[in-house]
Amino acid sequence: MAQKAPAAAAVPAKPQAPDGRPAIVVFGDSISAGFGLDAGQSFPDLLQKDLDARGVKYRVVNMGVSGDTTQDGLARLSIALAERPKIVLLELGANDGLRGIPSSVMQANLAQMIEAFQSAGAQVVLAGMTLPPNYGPEFIKRFDAVYAGLAEKYHVTLIPFLMAGVGGHQDMMQRDGLHPNAAGARRVEELVMKALAPLIGAR
């Protein structure tokens, strides 16, 4: 199941002005960016609303860029670090897989980002993805193993599959079969909140 498609052009979201609350940076691709959704429907937008409703004082900084690979993420890593995040949700890699980029390259890029965020004092939550069956079992196996391997090596929280309960469900997906619709984004946010809760003291 494909999770996202490369975008012809993508403009990074502008960081929010600091307001005293610690930052949760969502560093990802089109799933984070809310491709195809109305304003306020992306899962990072929903996450902010959820945090506010729970009285958890964090600000969510959405740095999702449609079409980004892990190499693209490295190129804008300094922008994310400038936010001095307390927590980073790292949601990259699916576009690497869809473009046939070797999993070893993806792994090295993600490792470099994790190390940079951890060195800056941020806790990392790694969002795992997967690929459509037509990419072949061996390629998919190597791709899937990257996330679990990195989570174990760097002792970071892992969401095994960010699109669990969404991907492959027509009522949760847009017509392209790649991106979550509004209902799907809500499901993704629930998974993210579940992973974040122990880190932020949320109930």
Locate predicted features:
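Residue-level signal for threonine
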Residues: 42, 69, 181
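Alpha-helical cap/lid subdomain in secreted, periplasmic
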Residues: 56, 72-203
